[in-house]
Amino acid sequence: MAPTPPSDTTRLRIATRESPLAMWQAEHVAKLLKKHGFQTEIVPLVSKGDTDMRPIDGTRQVGLFTKRIQQALVDDEADVAVHSLKDLPTEPDSRFVLAAVPPRESVLDALVFADNSPHLESQTGAESPLDYLPQGARVGTGSTRRLAQLKQLRPDLEVLPIRGNVQTRLAKLNAGEFDAIVLAHAGILRLEMTDLPHRLFPLDEMIPAPGQGALGIEVRSDDAGAMDAIANLNDAAARLAATAERKVLSELHGGCLAPIACHAKLETSNHGTELCLRAIVMSADGEQRLQEDARITVQPNDADLHVAEAHELGTLVAKRLRDKGADKLISTVRENH
C-alpha cells in the first residue's frame, strides 16, 4: 500500500550538499516523491568535505560529506537526507534509518580525457581505457581504491590526488594538470555529461566502491511519517547489493583509507535467484591483491530475509578476506597515510 501523502501544509524538507551532482540527486528524489503525491523542499548545505580540499586519505575522518547533512535531521532543519551511498559511513547510528535505496545507476568507473585530447586519437581498437595513455601518464583520482587498481594495471602511471566537485576536476584536467582523471560513470550520467571524452573500465579491471552508483535516503529513526513516505522509493535489488557490499566494508573496518572494492548483483540460475558478491582488498601500490567471490540463494517475496542474507554474504566474504590477511594489508595502508 502506498503511503498517505501529508497534508497540503506539510512538506518533506530534503537536505543535500549544494554541489551540482548532489543537487541533482536531491531533485531526483523530490521528483520521485512528487509522483507519490508528496510536496518537497530542497535544503542545500555545505559539508566539511566540500571545503576541506586536502586529499581525503590524509584527513583520517569519516563522514566528511554526510555529517552536516545528518545534523540537519537532528536539528529539524530537514526531514530527509540524500547521500551518495558510497559516502555514507557504515557504522550504525541509532538516530537515523536508511529508509530507501532507489534504483541504482551505473556502478562503473570512467577514464575521462581533456577536451581535444590527443590520446584518444593515438589508439584504435584499444581493449582497455588505459591503452590510450602513454607511458608515465598523469592520472588524477581522489580514491585509494582507484589508485591501487590503476597501479596494478599500469605501474608506470603517475597517479596524483585530485579533489573538488566534478566541474572543478574537469577544469583541472582541461588546464593540463592531468592526462586523464577517473570519475564515477553514475555522476557523468546524472549530470548529462555523456559528451565528455571518456572510456569505461570493465568490471574485471576496476571494481567499484561499496555502494557506488546508489543513493542512500536517510530519515530520523523517530519520524514514522517520513519513513513511510521514503520507503516507497526503495528498490529491492539495489538495496540488497549495496547491503552486501557495505557489510564487507563494515566488517573489515575499512573506512575511506583502505583500498577495498566490492560489487554485488542479483543473478538467476538453476538454483533460483542468487546474490553474487566479489570483493578485493589491495595494497596502495597495487602489488598485493586479495580477492573473494561468493554467492547465496535469496528467497523471493521476503524483504527482511533478503537483507539478512545480504548481511550473511558480506560477513562471509569479509571473513575469507581476513583469513587471507586483509587486516594486515589494511593496517599497512593506514600506517603509510
UniProtKB/Swiss-Prot annotation:
Record note on cofactor: Binds 1 dipyrromethane group covalently.
Other information: The porphobilinogen subunits are added to the dipyrromethane group.
Name the UniProt record assigns to this protein: Porphobilinogen deaminase
MF GO annotations: hydroxymethylbilane synthase activity
Organism whose genome encodes this protein: Rhodopirellula baltica (strain DSM 10527 / NCIMB 13988 / SH1)
Gene Ontology cellular-component annotations: cytoplasm
Function of the molecule: Tetrapolymerization of the monopyrrole PBG into the hydroxymethylbilane pre-uroporphyrinogen in several discrete steps.
Keyword annotations of the record: Porphyrin biosynthesis, Transferase
